[in-house]
Amino acid sequence: IGYLIGYLIVANLLLPIYYNLGLTSIYEYLYDRFGKKSHLVGSISFLISRVLGASFRLYLVAIVLQEFVLDDFGIPYEITVIISILLIWLYTRRGGIKTIVWTDTIQTTLMILAVVLSIHYINKDIGWTFAEFVTSSEFQEFNKIFVTDSIMERSYFLKSIIGGAFITICMTGLDQDMMQKNLTCKNIKEAKKNMIVFSFILTAVTFLFIVLGALLYIYSNQNGINIPLVDNSPRTDLLFPEIALRSGLGGFLGITFILGLIAAAYSSADSALTSLTTSVCVDILKIDSNKSSSKRTRKYVHVLMSA
């Protein structure tokens, strides 16, 4: 609910501002509204946060691929990372944002398909239909949506709704990585439509991930699968690959997991790379896109951001 409220605010408040000003980078608004220093601080803050965030996500995915798949083939971790970044750089170098839109669509479809198939195969192994799963006593332990016991509770429902709305406004409406695709729509009407449709799709996908998370815990409890340990600390993020690749559910589930994992990693990294290049060129270097020398500079920036 909080996410939906946040996306409606972004669609009806922030998007019109960006379109009326004809912005390429959303941080140009800071220059018009607050001046050069605020513009520079905003764009540099985005640069640092996005480099760290995208790098960390790609690092996590590379670790999972290395530990559960590529180690068996004797492929070094360094080679895995280099090949991943090189592939992302190659297809964003030529196509730009248009390529990102299409590849993100394909990658997101693969990721959602992986989640749906994972839910199906784990349910099938347990012996449940989906209807039996959502009505089971085991699932009831994980499906409490509205916590109303005490306002002091960390997950009290009003805190979750308000927090979700502000998270969406900050992480979507004020983030070049998330907004760049909306800024390529033909007009503000199309951009609003895209944002609102996306918000409802995201709600459905979030529900699927909640279902998958509950199902993973139920399956691991029933089959005596422990949460993997790293440096003697439990790593719940490794439970999914542990079940998908090592629990004996079949090779198809493992392949589905790997495809979904790669799709998620590439979708995040390629979008971040394009938005970083845009922000550096537009906000920091003030490059004129019509000059031939600027094209060379953009290529150098693209390579630097990849590194």
Language-model features and meaning:
Residues S233-Y266, D270, I287-Y300:
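Membrane-embedded translocation segments of transport machinery
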Residues Y3-Y7, L47-R50, I85-W89, Q107-M111, ...:
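Residue-level recognition of pore/gate-forming positions within transmembrane alpha-helices
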Residues K36-L40, I79-I82, T278-A307:
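Loop-to-transmembrane helix boundary motifs in multi-pass membrane proteins
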Residues I1, Y31, P76-Y77, T109-I255:
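Loop-to-helix junctions at membrane interfaces in multi-pass transport proteins
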Residues G2-R93, G163-M171, A263-D270:
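Helix-loop-helix module between adjacent transmembrane segments
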Residues L40-V41, E78-I83, L158-I162, L253-T256, ...:
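Hydrophobic alpha-helical transmembrane segments
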Residues L13-N20, Y27-D32, F46, W89-R93, ...:
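Helix-loop junctions at the membrane interface of multi-pass solute transporters
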